[in-house]
Design a protein with these regions (language model features):
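Active-site neighborhoods of divalent-metal-dependent phosphate/nucleic-acid chemistry enzymes
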Residues: 79-134
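C-terminal binding/interaction regions
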Residues: 130, 139, 143
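Short, well-structured N-terminal submotif of metal-dependent ribonuclease cores
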Residues: 1-44, 48-65
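Phosphate- and divalent-cation-binding pockets in alpha/beta enzyme and binding domains
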Residues: 24, 44, 92, 134-136
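Active-site-proximal, substrate-binding regions of enzyme catalytic domains
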Residues: 40-99
């Protein structure tokens, strides 16, 4: 079995909400499926979609469609629910923060995503966030 692909929230939002990166996200996702989907990713993705409503980037109807599509993709295995070993992920997170936050300005959630990918032994990490991409690269992930 191939190593899992970890797509961060910036990538996943572009799959479910039309934005400047959506065309690229759809093209990339077609080659990378299935995408591992942790409880952390699910929470942040659902919240990011709701935040798009607050920012008036999408309507409530678009929000409901996006949330429905996420559930459909979970059921179809496009988003593959995986358990996360939190103690292991938090160990990685502490090490990443200690090594890279002061130089990169890495945010806590970005560190948690990269640490989660490491804990899951992800074969690939996909993101549209430049700082997170650099952090993942420095952590040894294929980005």
């Amino acid at each position: 079995m191939a190593a899992p692909v970890y797509a961060d929230t910036s990538f996943l939002v572009s799959l479910y909400i039309q934005d400047a990166n959506s065309v690229q996200a759809v093209a990339d996702a077609a080659k990378l499926l299935p995408l591992c989907f942790t409880a952390l990713l699910e929470h942040e993705l659902r919240n990011a979609i709701r935040l798009c409503v607050f920012r008036r980037q999408i309507t409530t109807t678009q929000r409901e469609k996006a949330l429905h599509d996420i559930e459909s993709d979970k059921a179809a295995g496009v988003l593959h629910a995986v358990p996360l070993d939190w103690p292991k992920a938090l160990k990685y997170a502490e090490a990443l923060g200690r090594r890279h936050t002061e130089a990169l300005g890495a945010r806590g959630m970005d560190i948690l995503h990269v640490a989660s990918a490491l804990a899951l032994k992800a074969g690939r990490f996909v993101t549209f966030d430049e700082k997170q991409r650099e952090l993942a690269r420095l952590a040894g992930l294929n980005v």
